[in-house]
Swiss-Prot record:
SUPFAM superfamilies: DNA breaking-rejoining enzymes. The gene is xerS. FtsK is required for recombination. Its main location: cytoplasm. The active site is at R210, K234, H306, R309, H332, Y341. It is found in: Cytoplasm. This is Tyrosine recombinase XerS. One of its GO terms (molecular function) is tyrosine-based site-specific recombinase activity. The lineage of its organism: Bacteria, Bacillati, Bacillota, Bacilli, Lactobacillales.
Length: 356
């Protein structure tokens, strides 16, 4: 989604919200949470507060009038009723007879509400230096996680990774083979952003950074000589991330054409740009997702930028057998998250043994 459109939608949702949600928004913007994350949270709050009005828990006329005391006095039974409502209500704007939303969607809603409740009960300060209230009902609400072993998850994910020679093969395909399949009109469009697209995909494959971390990079965050980028991790923490050497020529090619191709001024600090009506703008996450999906589907299988992160992590573990090193590269505080890659690599080793 374009940044301008995203901000417009955020403003519309903010106009609906109670004052304490607006305070929460400002606080998280300073962390900083991304606008995309805050937009998704505001959508969840809109859904929740609409239910609060519909169910009669609050007799306010509109969402913005719902008092803080409603959240303070919300019972566990009330919250469970909301979960049942979300699970059983008909799907909106969908050509299906299926009832309710997925457990993943419900968990996302509960995560957003947990964040709001934590802010109100622990993080915010009133004039006396105390939180607005202390009772956090969300701590009593359990969430159901999808039951899946690491082995099963590894099996599901490994077909969507570009391992071994496929990493370089994917980049070579975009650079050399993909253009041959295009019409003259499509080729002209492709050539306008070819260097940028290759640089972004190479960086994702060579560093394992999250999509949000990549699109938020500024020029000053890239050190080509050292092949290091400085990123803002989740929670607003700054981190220096090493980048594999194979990405360097793609980054150099992009930087060589960046200023002229995208008509930059000194104020255009974003590393990766797009032209909109002749004006350079920071590329947004949605554009990168569509780009990765298009190229990957033509090459092998449709994937997301997060699968490129998994690709780097798997290759790095295969080369080092160090979960600590992989967790540091990905910006994880614990090695538990990297257990997945040991299962994927074990499958690769089994396949190699079977071929002997």
């Amino acid at each position: 989604m374009k940044r301008e459109i995203l901000l417009e939608r955020i403003d519309k949702l903010k106009q609906l919200m109670p004052w304490y949600v607006l305070e929460y928004y400002q606080s998280k913007l300073a962390v900083p949470y991304s606008f995309t994350t805050l937009y998704e949270y505001l959508k969840e709050y809109d859904r929740f507060f609409s239910w609060v009005l519909e169910s009669g828990i609050s007799n306010a006329d509109k969402i913005s009038d719902i008092p803080l005391s409603v959240l303070e006095n919300m019972s566990k039974k009330d919250m469970e009723s909301f979960i049942l409502y979300x699970r059983e209500r008909p799907l909106l704007n969908a050509n299906t007879t299926k009832q309710g939303v997925s457990q993943t969607t419900i968990n996302r809603t509960l995560s957003a509400l947990s964040s709001l409740y934590k802010y109100l009960t622990e993080e915010v300060e009133n004039d006396q230096g105390e939180p607005y209230f202390y009772r956090n009902v969300m701590k009593k609400v359990s969430t159901k996680k999808k039951k899946e072993t690491l082995a099963a998850r590894a099996e599901n994910i490994k077909q969507k990774l570009f391992l071994g020679d496929e990493t370089e093969g994917f980049l070579t395909y975009i650079d050399q083979e993909h253009p041959q399949q295009l019409s003259n009109r499509a080729l002209s469009s492709f050539n306008k952003n070819k260097e940028r697209d290759l640089a972004i995909i190479a960086l994702l494959l060579a560093s394992g950074v999250r999509l949000s971390e990549a699109v938020n990079l500024d020029l000053r965050d890239l050190n080509l000589k050292m092949m290091v980028i400085d990123v803002t991790r989740k929670g607003g923490k700054r981190d220096s991330v090493n980048v594999a050497a194979f990405a360097k020529p793609y980054l150099e090619n992009y930087l060589a054409i960046r200023n002229q191709r995208y008509k930059t001024e000194k104020t255009d600090t974003a590393l990766f740009l797009t032209l909109y009506r002749g004006v350079p703008n920071r590329i947004d996450a949605s554009s990168v997702e569509k780009m990765v999906a298009k190229y990957s589907e033509d090459f092998k299988v449709r994937v997301t930028p997060h699968k490129l992160r998994h690709t780097l992590a798997t290759r790095l573990y295969d080369a080092t057998k160090s979960q600590v090193l992989v967790s540091h590269q990905l910006g994880h505080a614990s090695t538990q998250v990297t257990d997945l890659y040991t299962h994927i690599v074990n499958d690769e080793q089994k396949n190699a043994l079977d071929s002997l």
